[in-house]
Amino acid sequence: MFLNSLDLPGQPEDSRIVVAMSGGVDSSVVAGLLKREGYNVIGITLQLYDHGAATHRVGACCAGQDIEDARRVAEMLGIPHYVLDYEKRFREAVIDPFAESYAHGETPVPCIACNQTVKFADLLATARELGADALATGHYIRSRSHGAHRALFRPLDNDRDQSYFLFATTQEQIDYLRFPLGDLPKARVREIAAEMGLVVANKHDSQDICFVPQGKYSDVIAKLRPEAANPGFIVHIDGKILGKHSGIVNYTVGQRRGIGVSTGEALYVVYLDVENARVIVGPREMLETHKLFLRDVNWLGDESLDNFPSQGIEVAVKVRSTRPPHLACLHYKEGVFSVDLLECENGVAPGQACVLYDGNGHEARILGGGFVTHSERAADIEVMLKRVLCNLETKDSVSSQLKTTAS
């Protein structure tokens, strides 16, 4: 059977493709390339967030100017273009959970939730309703045939690798999605945009968190979850109170800058005691993490979870989008996924994504991933952290009893 460039049967003109057009250079080039090849292309733009400063901020995603840019590109290419209002859905599925997670002391990655619940769920369903044979996006990731299905692989341009944000893509979605930019470097994509005369050829790349004006995520969270801005104490890992803070929302595990205390010692956020509004700080070595436990894992590997090797399997993992994958061992037992890191990571926070690969090479296959529930550090560090928390609880209890007696 003849397959076209998207691995679909027949000639390009036999296939209808929906392109998710964000108004940026990448998705615009995808639409242009597919149109040039002869595919029946339909552009769809999701209006996700269009309020206040985010609307006109350079690098905002799916806001007013982006929608206009997508419309202009579609008009130039001669393809139909539709705008779907997904603001309410985006608020419920992405923004609210993001604020809730941060208020609980986690470090969430909203782009993953957006791909998982909006772009690759709702938009994909719309593409099917339009009779499309595939949904194409401008993400930098590769999709190839793998047995009876398709699989995801790291892209040619590792500097633009977006696999970290796509690990939650289900097998059904992977089979339907196409990523034409996976084999192109970003520089070439911009060249193609210029050759096509696209108005977005020199447009800035979008930022990761599109709904946070000027990067002040704390303002968004404090507005939605005021309790996250409750004041509390900054406490050294040795138990000494160093000062006060204006809300857990301003901190994340691993943070060094902007802690708000000066001791002459390089201090990092080691732990967030959300219940008592305490920020625990300490030296960098207190952040060394050796083991991770994951929740909400999307497993795309070939091994059956029913017969998962008792010794685990060798994988590579990413706990940050900008870091290359590092070797580790993945275990699965009684419904629990855990990862033994062969190289320790610093400052891994609950809520972060841990993405799994079949190796640390440039063309590694994505095996899925999950979100960190908690981590384990060296035994002596764990003991020290538990001791300081226990001592603080004891002090609180004594203080409370004294106040009760005095009254």
UniProtKB/Swiss-Prot annotation:
Signal peptide annotation: none
Ranges for region Interaction with tRNA: 160-162
Site feature location: Interaction with tRNA: 139, 352
Binding positions (ATP): 20-27, 46, 138
Pfam families with a match to the protein in the record: tRNA_Me_trans (PF03054), tRNA_Me_trans_C (PF20258), tRNA_Me_trans_M (PF20259)
Principal cellular location given in the protein's record: cytoplasm
Catalytic activity of the protein: S-sulfanyl-L-cysteinyl-[protein] + uridine(34) in tRNA + AH2 + ATP = 2-thiouridine(34) in tRNA + L-cysteinyl-[protein] + A + AMP + diphosphate + H(+)
Disulfide bond sites: 114-210
Active site positions: 114, 210
One Gene Ontology term, aspect cellular component: cytoplasm
Keywords from the named record: ATP-binding, Cytoplasm, Disulfide bond, Nucleotide-binding, RNA-binding, Transferase, tRNA processing, tRNA-binding
Intracellular or extracellular location(s): Cytoplasm
Family the entry assigns: Belongs to the MnmA/TRMU family.
Protein's job: Catalyzes the 2-thiolation of uridine at the wobble position (U34) of tRNA, leading to the formation of s(2)U34.
UniProt protein name: tRNA-specific 2-thiouridylase MnmA
Native source organism of the sequence: Bartonella tribocorum (strain CIP 105476 / IBS 506)
Taxonomic lineage of the native organism: Bacteria, Pseudomonadati, Pseudomonadota, Alphaproteobacteria, Hyphomicrobiales
Gene name linked to the record: mnmA
